[in-house]
Amino acid sequence: MKDMITIQNLTKTYGKHRGVEDVTFSVREGEIFGFLGPNGAGKSTTIRSMLGLIKYDQGEIRINGFDSVKDREKILADIGYMPSEAWFYPGMKIREILKYSAAVRKVDCTDEAEKLCDRLQVDVKRKINELSLGNRKKVSIICAMQHRPKLFVFDEPTSGLDPLMQNVFFELIQEYVNEGATCMLSTHVLSEVRNYCTRVAIMKEGKLFVTDTVDNLLSSRSKRIKMIRDGEKLDYIYKDNLNNLYKELEGHHIEDIIIEEPSIEEVFMHYYLKEEK
C-alpha cells in the first residue's frame, strides 16, 4: 500500500519559539489516521505546512507523490481541508457558500452537495450568521467533502456537533474511505481514534512522540493497576513486567487488586506524561 502523505524531518520555528522539530511520519492511502496531541503540540503547524499555508524551515512533505511546495496547486485540488474554526463571510446563504467553494475548485459539486446537506440536515436557504456553531461546522464539513477529494484533512471536526451528527460524519468518512479516499483526523476525542482510526501519531512539545497502530498501543505491556495497599487506594498505569510488580508488593498488605487493560485515554496520558510507576 502506497503512502498518501510522507513527512520527513519537518522543522518549523517561529522566531525563538518552537513550532515543530524533525517530525517524520507517513499516512497510508485508504486509512483513517489519527493525529493527537494537546494544544501547542505542533499539530496545526504540521497541517498548515502540509497545505502550504505556512513555509517550513527544513524537511520535505509529499502528498500523493507531489512536493508540497512545488506542486501545491495540484495537491490542493484533491484535498478536502476543514480547519478547527468555521469562519465564513457573514450574510452569505449556505447555498452561496457551497457554490463559491465549488467554483474555486472549478468543479460541479451540485449532486454531492445536495446529498451531504440532506445527510447532515443543512438548510441551504439560511444565512451563515443565523447558524449555531454546530451548524456552521456542518457547512464546513460539506465544503471539505463536496468535491470528493482523495485526501481529507480534518482539524477537530466534531466539536460542536451533537452525537447524532457525529455519527453521520463518521459514516460519511467511512463511505469515502471505502471508495479509496484517505483521512487524516486531528482530534482531542480519543474515543473517535479508538473507534475509527487504524494508526495514530502522538505529538508532544513540537516533536513526534510515537506512531503506531491503535491495536498495538492498546495491547502494549502497560497495565492499569487498581489496588488497596497498606490501607492506601492506588490507581495508576504500570509499564514494567508484572512479575516485577508482584516482587514489589512482597511485604505489603494487599486488601484488593485489579489488573486490567488501559483505555486509549490512559494510553495517551501514559505516552504524553511518561507516567511511570
What name fits each language-model region?
Residues 141:
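Hydrophobic anchor residue at the start of the ABC signature
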Residues 152-156, 161:
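Catalytic Walker B motif of ABC-type/P-loop ATPase nucleotide-binding domains
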Residues 168-244:
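ABC transporter nucleotide-binding domain
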